[in-house]
Amino acid sequence: YLKSRGVTRNTSSFYMRNLRSAYKLAVQENLTIDRQPFHCVYTGVDKTKKRAISIPDIRKIKSADLSHRPALDFARDMLMFSFYTRGMSFVDMAYLCKKDVASGYIIYRRRKTGQKLSIALVPEMQAIICKYQNSTQYLLPIITKEDGTERQQYRNQLIRINRHLKKIGTMTGISIPLSTGQRIFPVGGNGQL
């Protein structure tokens, strides 16, 4: 079923691992008999090729005239902010707070690992921060209301920005599909264009 819907092998494996865990819990709670339905089901993970955006492509994105397309301009700015911050994840960008900026650095903890990171604030990052000043505690306007819906706002922006990045990729002739999860910090790079 999943294959017929165009779901990749790794995504299918993720779903099957979750389903298998739920089934094992049901067996432990004596809600069903263990018939081992996952005996021959692949639940491993295949290595995927990481595709980085090249510096010339980053330059194309940066120089694209999006002045009359504010939604695309915002998506581009978020991608560029990630580039300047050495590939900061979108979720970390969403939850960055103004208090995380001090003495010329952004100092934050990765949401995924809890690892504390420090990144020098460069003029290009500062320009994006100034462009999107807002009245919330958050540095960037990914989360715009502090009303308990922050996680949903993050998810909605993630979907919206990824859709806009794909449009930018098409407009600029970039062959790699752009997304917030895209590797944009080339090995050996320093975030400079």
Q: In which residue ranges do the predicted regions lie?
A:
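N-terminal core-binding DNA-recognition domain of tyrosine recombinases/integrases
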Residues: Y1-K49, A64-S67
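Short, basic (Lys/Arg/His-rich) helix/loop patches that form interaction surfaces
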Residues: S63, S67-P70, N162-L193
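Short, contiguous acidic/charged loop-to-helix segments that flank catalytic cores in large enzymes
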Residues: L66-R69, I107-L117, G148-Q157, S175-S179
